């Protein structure tokens, strides 16, 4: 059975710290043993470590399966009887009774067996990483009292990996958390357009069931809509619930509008009110008192049909002040809920600010903001899967009921009643096709981590991008510390998809909480409290950088705080309730990795956060000189580095594994992933960073993965940058690079493509993977082994055969000679065609891996497939013109020119710069952070020493001792909103260490005199020079460049297809045609519109003329013209084509004989329309 938690807990324990904000003397990475010494410019000490970045996924899944880890955490919170997600569904479903109530079936105690195969094997063999789920089913015969109990298998249940992902059919997927409107009661205010009156309405929204809506209209009557049907007076509903007119008058006598509504209501008594409601809900059906009573009961008061869920009941009670302090049990509506809602609405319309409910509780009367995070909650992975299981179980319930009535009572056992197919199908459907189960973004470790922390308002039960307005997409004050205001997509999904903030967590109701330090009587304590958005609205919160002394008292008498709705003001320190735990509290992980974020415009910061996720892993990773302190935790939690589970000594190290002898005497071997292909074709490779004999502590990084160096996230390279125009070659964001980066593989990346082919049974016989391919020369087969599969290490290019395969052709009538051959040689002479797997057009590389699956090896293959072969081809891509590079501040560009290193501008000591960026890329875009990063990068690369002979300079007073001097190549961190200040940067630039010749290259203004590499002359003005962190993005020119000579045509228009995927041509569009016409290039234009496009007859005749060396014939009529005629004729218009002398021209259908003859002679296949794949063209 499965025991323990999903994720080991490495270094995430909370420690109490003093509230003092004195400077920490060691690296901020000190919570992780063996971390690189990155010195920090942070001025504030954070009282709380960053929580586990994958907790939003793992905690939710552990709740679903009810793991021991989750139960222990629930018990520590004081939850005496914690119920897991699966248990909850089984309790809801049980008991399933037959129609007479004589038999029942109950479920309990869900449990899992061991997973069927480890993660790597599942990926390799296209299996699902799953564990068998068993439940205890109990059948009770109420007539005899007989009880039969069995353990029933409920199917294989997909399990979450340690990294918070699922392996479904061999591919790694992520279930994204969904942001939805919470069930509850919502009051709204609108202005009537005709009378300009303020109108109020309220919706009672359940988790499952019919909506109940009340409103006050412009005639000042209170109405109700049940299940979105026609409006009727609210008093009808109250009477249907058993209230008399006297009771209504007694409860609502204070309200003029309720009295007028009662007067206009013509129904008398409960029965008439029930029948009136029934007629509105079921028009056309004969109403009876019983059916009307049952309908109303079922709609709102029966748990099977109506469910507010725990969160809905909590929200209703909180809003209306009901059942204060009582345990929440009922999840249906109550009569008191309905009455209290109506009273709240009436008082709201009358402008009252508070209302006292029957329990004596006074509640504020106000409208709700639907975009407030107090009213939006998260459906995390566990709840999403739980809902899907609930759907499957309810389908199974129907089957069980039917079987109870049809089967022999004596022979019934739980096993015979249960059909698990609907449950298995529902789970499969969710993981395979749901909008929220997504193909994992594995471009680099950060993209995977961000994907798991994504919040989506789209999906089933959510919004659609077409209907979502500006309000729901906008940044809201309640997002602070919960959802990042920066990181969101740029396209049509902007604002609908967000990212969880660094410190945020999800509470049991699904609301996002963020931590604050408690302030008591003006003193900041170490006590941390997590608040939801609506709780936070009731308090006054100070910023994390409000100055405080050693004892935690505010140094200033008036403190800058924020109140409800994001209002900012100064208040006395005694009025402050809470204080932020960290300046980076409001941003997400990717945004927190942008240094000097505080100096960047939000639009550019958004691009910077998004482009970090597109960075390609390079052959050799390099951590940034200027980081933010977030790099280490992000890399560890992303799960691509190898972390020591126990303290001990490294016993053995090789490229493939590391063996650690732990202090407790146990030995553990960690296997490295070597050159594996990620979901996005990038290379995932792990390499050890420890040596044999080294001492390691638990939680220490012992091997780097892709995009990591020494356990820190390393998405790009530190390059020497000059910010200047250069001969116009870096106009419009183009970038000029030094050839050194090409020659030394500085920005080289490895990309791995997977090619797959299978041999199936066809109607004409079995396909065969073989080296014996018809009409293929020996040179082409040189790299194939005896099975017909390419050898590992072979260099291949487009059109080369990777796997030889032949498919039987249709048998034709054999000639006597062929029959003789068949008789002599048997099957050898049968006709087969070449259907080999070839390298697609435009691709090349080296074969690095082959996997063969066949029935002989007991591999699971789809029906009809005999053998399956996968070939992995790796390509080393050097940086080239047209590739896209970017910094971390949204400063992106395409490489316009690669110059020889000797032509690049150089520093006075002869060092040529690596990259030239245009000055125009900064001022208008307002991302000044890139300039500050460039300056600090130079300081970090050069090293510095602050002259303290005459005392510490004013600008360095706040710097700790470790920042007074540093050796060259010292990595530094400047955390967001708490980093290096401009005056500190200026002082450090004046304090940099000289080079080996004793010269300082860059002055105190961050500029250097540069010399032109071509002439040796200095440029007229000093140029900003420094080190910037540059990333190579996934938009590579090799994937985009494309050319076509001949290829597939569209079936209807006979024009070439478009796009690289279809091996299409370049469209000569309307604007291009007009350009040709403007130049009077009539013959060229005619040629483009006919024989180069869709003149089917002319195409072949021209081909024939070229082959024979004859003159090009006259073009014919394009196929698209014939299509136009047909379109017009389909509209019943009689359209004829007339010659110049007015005679009708008949357009012949089909191919003419000349065409057939020419095609046969030239060996052209004219039937090739919309080819199924590019391989067919080779």
Curated annotation (Swiss-Prot):
Q: Cross-referenced PROSITE patterns, in alphabetical order?
A: RNA_POL_BETA
Q: Does the keyword Transferase apply?
A: yes
User: Among the record's GO biological process terms, what is one?
Assistant: DNA-templated transcription
The cross-references to InterPro entries, in alphabetical order and at most eight, read: DNA-dir_RNA_pol_bsu_ext_1_sf, DNA-dir_RNA_pol_bsu_external_1, DNA-dir_RNA_pol_su2, DNA-dir_RNAP_su2_dom, DNA-dir_RNAP_su2_hyb_sf, RNA_pol_bsu_bac, RNA_pol_bsu_CS, RNA_pol_bsu_protrusion
Q: Which keywords does this Swiss-Prot/TrEMBL entry list? A: DNA-directed RNA polymerase, Nucleotidyltransferase, Transcription, Transferase
One GO CC term, this protein: DNA-directed RNA polymerase complex
| Residue ranges, compositional bias (Low complexity) | 17-33
Enzyme Commission code? 2.7.7.6
Read off the Pfam families from this record: RNA_pol_Rpb2_1, RNA_pol_Rpb2_2, RNA_pol_Rpb2_3, RNA_pol_Rpb2_45, RNA_pol_Rpb2_6, RNA_pol_Rpb2_7
Q: Where is this region: Disordered?
A: 1-37
Reaction equation(s) it catalyzes: RNA(n) + a ribonucleoside 5'-triphosphate = RNA(n+1) + diphosphate
Give the molecular function GO annotations.
Answer: DNA binding; DNA-directed RNA polymerase activity; ribonucleoside binding
What is the recorded function of this protein according to its Swiss-Prot or TrEMBL entry?
DNA-dependent RNA polymerase catalyzes the transcription of DNA into RNA using the four ribonucleoside triphosphates as substrates.
Which NCBIfam families does the UniProt record give? PRK00405.1, rpoB
Q: Assembly and interactions?
A: The RNAP catalytic core consists of 2 alpha, 1 beta, 1 beta' and 1 omega subunit. When a sigma factor is associated with the core the holoenzyme is formed, which can initiate transcription.
Record's family? Belongs to the RNA polymerase beta chain family.
Name the UniProt record assigns to this protein = DNA-directed RNA polymerase subunit beta
Q: Which species is listed as the source?
A: Mycobacterium leprae (strain TN)
């Amino acid at each position: 059975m499965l025991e323990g938690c999903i994720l080991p807990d490495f270094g995430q324990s909370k420690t109490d710290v003093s509230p003092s904000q004195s400077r920490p003397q060691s690296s901020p990475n000190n919570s992780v043993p063996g971390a690189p010494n990155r010195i920090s410019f942070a001025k504030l000490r954070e009282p709380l470590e960053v929580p586990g970045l994958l907790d939003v996924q793992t905690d939710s899944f552990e709740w679903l399966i009810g793991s021991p880890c989750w139960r222990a955490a629930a018990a520590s919170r004081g939850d005496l009887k914690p119920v897991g997600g699966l248990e909850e569904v089984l309790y809801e479903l049980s008991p399933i009774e037959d129609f007479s109530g004589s038999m029942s079936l109950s479920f309990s105690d869900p449990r899992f067996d061991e997973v069927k195969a480890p993660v790597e094997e599942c990926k390799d063999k296209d299996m699902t990483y799953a564990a068998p789920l068993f439940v205890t089913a109990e059948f009770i015969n109420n007539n005899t009292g007989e009880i039969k109990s069995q353990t029933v298998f409920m199917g294989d249940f997909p399990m979450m990996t340690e990294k918070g992902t699922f392996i479904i059919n061999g591919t790694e997927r992520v279930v994204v958390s969904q942001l939805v409107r919470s069930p509850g009661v919502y009051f709204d205010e609108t202005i009537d357009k005709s009378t300009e009156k303020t109108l109020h309405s309220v919706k009672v929204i359940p988790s499952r069931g019919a909506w109940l809506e009340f409103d006050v209209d412009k005639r000042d009557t209170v109405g109700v809509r049940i299940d979105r049907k026609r409006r009727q007076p609210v008093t009808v509903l109250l009477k249907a619930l058993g209230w008399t007119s006297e009771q209504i008058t007694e409860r609502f006598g204070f309200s003029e509008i309720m009295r007028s509504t009662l007067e206009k209501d013509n129904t008398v008594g409960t029965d008439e009110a029930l029948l009136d409601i029934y007629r509105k809900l079921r028009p056309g059906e004969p109403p009876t008192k019983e059916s009307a009573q049952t309908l109303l009961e079922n709609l709102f008061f029966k748990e099977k049909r109506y469910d507010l869920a725990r969160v809905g009941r909590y929200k209703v009670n909180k809003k209306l002040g009901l059942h204060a302090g009582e345990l929440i049990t009922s999840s249906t509506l109550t009569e008191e809920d309905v009455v209290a809602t109506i009273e709240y609405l009436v008082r709201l319309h009358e402008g009252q600010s508070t209302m006292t409910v029957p329990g004596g509780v006074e509640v504020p009367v106000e409208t709700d903001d639907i975009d407030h995070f107090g009213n939006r909650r998260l459906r995390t992975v566990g709840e999403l899967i739980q809902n899907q299981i609930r759907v499957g179980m309810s389908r199974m319930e129907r089957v069980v009921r039917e079987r109870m009535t049809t089967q022999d009572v004596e022979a019934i056992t739980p096993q015979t009643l249960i059909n698990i197919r609907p449950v298995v199908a529902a789970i499969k459907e969710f993981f395979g096709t749901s909008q929220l189960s997504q193909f994992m973004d594995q471009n680099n470790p950060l993209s995977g981590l961000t994907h798991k922390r994504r919040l989506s308002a789209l999906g089933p039960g959510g919004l659609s991008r077409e209907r979502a307005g500006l309000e729901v997409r906008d940044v809201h004050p309640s997002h602070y510390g919960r959802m990042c205001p920066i990181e969101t997509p740029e396209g049509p999904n902007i604002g609908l998809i967000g990212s969880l903030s660094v410190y945020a967590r999800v509470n049991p109701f699904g609301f996002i909480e963020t931590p604050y330090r408690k302030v008591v009587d003006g003193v900041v304590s170490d006590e941390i409290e997590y608040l939801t958005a609506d709780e936070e609205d009731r308090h006054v919160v100070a910023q994390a950088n409000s100055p405080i002394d050693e004892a935690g008292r505010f140094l200033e008498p008036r403190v800058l705080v924020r109140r409800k709705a994001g209002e900012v003001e100064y208040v006395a320190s005694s009025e402050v309730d809470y204080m932020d735990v960290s300046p980076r509290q409001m941003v997400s992980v990717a945004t927190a990795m942008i240094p000097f974020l505080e100096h960047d415009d939000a639009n550019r910061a958004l691009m910077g956060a998004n482009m970090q996720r597109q960075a390609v892993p390079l052959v050799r990773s390099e951590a940034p000189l200027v980081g933010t302190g977030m790099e280490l935790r992000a890399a560890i939690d992303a799960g691509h580095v190898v972390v020591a589970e126990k303290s001990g000594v490294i016993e053995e190290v090789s490229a493939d594994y590391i063996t650690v002898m732990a202090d407790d005497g146990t030995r553990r071997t960690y296997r490295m992933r070597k050159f594996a292909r990620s979901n996005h074709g990038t290379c995932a490779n792990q390499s050890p960073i420890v040596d044999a004999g080294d001492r390691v502590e638990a939680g220490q990084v012992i091997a780097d993965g892709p995009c990591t160096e020494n356990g820190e996230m390393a998405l790009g390279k530190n390059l020497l940058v000059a910010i200047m125009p250069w001969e116009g070659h870096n106009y419009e964001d183009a970038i000029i690079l030094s050839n050194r980066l090409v020659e030394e593989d500085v920005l080289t990346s490895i990309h791995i493509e997977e090619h797959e082919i299978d041999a199936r049974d066809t109607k004409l016989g079995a396909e065969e993977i073989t080296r014996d391919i018809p009409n293929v020369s020996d040179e082409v087969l040189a790299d194939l082994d005896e099975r017909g599969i390419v050898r590992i290490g072979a260099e291949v290019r487009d059109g080369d055969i990777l796997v030889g395969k032949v498919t039987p052709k249709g048998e034709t009538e054999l000639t006597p000679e062929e029959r003789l051959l068949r008789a002599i040689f048997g099957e050898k002479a049968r006709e087969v065609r070449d259907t080999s797997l070839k390298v697609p057009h435009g691709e090349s590389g080296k074969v690095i891996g082959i996997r063969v699956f066949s029935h002989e090896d007991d591999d699971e293959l789809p029906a009809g497939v005999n053998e399956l072969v996968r070939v992995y081809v790796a390509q080393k891509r050097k940086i080239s013109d047209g590739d896209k590079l970017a910094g971390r501040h949204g400063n992106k560009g395409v490489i316009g020119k690669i110059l020889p290193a000797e032509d690049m501008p150089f520093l006075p000591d002869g060092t040529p710069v690596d990259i030239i960026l245009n000055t125009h890329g900064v001022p208008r875009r307002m991302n000044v952070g890139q300039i500050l990063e460039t300056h600090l990068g130079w300081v970090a690369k050069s090293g510095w020493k602050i002259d303290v002979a005459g005392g510490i300079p004013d600008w360095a007073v706040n710097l700790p001792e470790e920042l007074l001097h540093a050796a060259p190549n010292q990595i530094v961190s400047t955390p967001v909103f708490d980093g290096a200040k401009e005056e500190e940067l200026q002082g450090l630039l004046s304090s940099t260490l000289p080079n080996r010749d004793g010269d300082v290259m860059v002055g105190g203004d961050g500029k250097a005199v540069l010399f032109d590499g071509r002439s040796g002359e200095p440029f007229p003005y000093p140029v900003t020079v420094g080190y910037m962190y540059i990333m190579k993005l996934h938009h590579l020119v090799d994937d985009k460049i494309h050319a076509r000579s001949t290829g597939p045509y569209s079936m209807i228009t006979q024009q070439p297809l478009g796009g690289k995927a279809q091996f299409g041509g370049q469209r000569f569009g309307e604007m291009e045609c007009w350009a040709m016409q403007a130049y009077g290039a009539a013959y060229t234009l005619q040629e483009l519109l006919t024989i180069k496009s869709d003149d089917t007859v002319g195409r072949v005749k021209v081909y024939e003329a070229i082959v024979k060396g004859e003159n090009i014939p006259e073009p014919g009529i394009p196929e698209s013209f014939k299509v136009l005629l047909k379109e017009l004729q389909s509209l019943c218009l009689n359209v004829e084509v007339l010659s110049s002398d007015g005679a009708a021209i008949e357009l012949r259908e089909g191919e003419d004989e000349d065409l057939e003859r020419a095609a046969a002679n030239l060996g052209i296949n004219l039937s090739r329309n919309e080819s199924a794949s590019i391989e067919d063209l080779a």
